[in-house]
């Protein structure tokens, strides 16, 4: 029975070695992946599953990329802390807040309707009496609470002593509709969304007025950590060219963008000042 026993020992060892090798391959292939972490303070994107699936399918054509969307700023920041083999997709407001702490460099910015800079506005109903000083009432917004409050405070410069009550909605257009249908007192949205509403529903938009305007800001930013190990030029190039083919264009539409553009010195200065 010795040869048989020896054969079984050999077989068991071989099987274990194979399992070990497979595990090693699986783990190391996971390690070699370049993650693209996405979190936007400006949109309330809730179709994460399809977003991840669509982006992974598209990016896999170019190499070991993996798309990871987040719905929470805290979780996103914990995840990217200390990571070098990743790219970050985040709003310009968020980038300005964390770029020093996380040693980030901006590479591209997203264009919406062909425009690099967007303006945020506060819209209210034309017939609503001037909002009582101190009590702003309900604000509809598709942006994160932190970003909404920060932007409103700088727009109104401390005019309201009470904090803003925010009604979170999926999209900017929903925020505007909320005011149109009397569900909220004010809407915090992009100027481009209001222009869109004027086209879709001129009657509803004519009942609304712009109450405050913010400064022009860049949209979504693609940023790299300073110690990025991959081929940064190749990676940036791949993202930048997404709008060149129908597949890529469809994916960036899911982020509310129509193309990417490189940042110039003036953009960087504004972003990092």
PLM features: residue spans?
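Bacterial N-terminal signal peptides
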Residues: 14-23
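Short helix-initiation/N-cap motifs at beta->coil->alpha
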Residues: 67-79, 165-177, 216-218
């Amino acid at each position: 029975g010795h040869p048989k026993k020896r054969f079984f020992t050999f077989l068991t060892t071989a099987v274990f070695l194979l399992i070990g090798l497979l595990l090693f391959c699986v783990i190391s292939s996971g390690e070699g992946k370049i993650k693209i972490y996405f979190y936007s303070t400006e949109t309330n994107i809730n179709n994460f599953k399809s977003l991840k699936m669509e982006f992974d399918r598209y990016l896999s054509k170019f190499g070991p990329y993996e798309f990871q969307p987040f719905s929470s700023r805290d979780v996103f920041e914990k995840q990217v802390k200390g990571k070098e083999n990743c790219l970050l997709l985040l709003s310009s407001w968020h980038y300005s807040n964390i770029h020093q702490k996380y040693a980030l460099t901006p590479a591209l910015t997203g264009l919406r309707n062909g425009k690099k800079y967007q303006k945020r506005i506060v819209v209210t109903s034309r017939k609503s009496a001037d909002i009582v000083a101190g009590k702003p009432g309900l604000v509809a917004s598709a942006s994160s609470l932190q970003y909404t409050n920060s932007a409103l405070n700088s727009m109104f410069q401390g005019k309201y002593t009470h904090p803003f009550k925010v009604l979170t909605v999926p999209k900017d257009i929903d925020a505007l509709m909320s005011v149109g249908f009397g569900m909220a007192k004010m809407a915090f949205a992009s100027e481009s969304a209001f222009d869109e509403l004027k086209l879709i529903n001129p009657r509803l938009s004519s009942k609304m007025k712009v109450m405050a305007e913010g400064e022009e800001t860049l949209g979504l930013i693609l940023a790299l950590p300073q110690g990025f190990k991959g081929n940064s030029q190749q990676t940036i190039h791949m993202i930048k060219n997404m709008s060149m083919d129908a597949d890529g264009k469809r994916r960036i539409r899911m982020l509310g963008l129509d193309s990417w553009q490189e940042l110039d010195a003036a953009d960087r200065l504004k972003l990092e000042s």
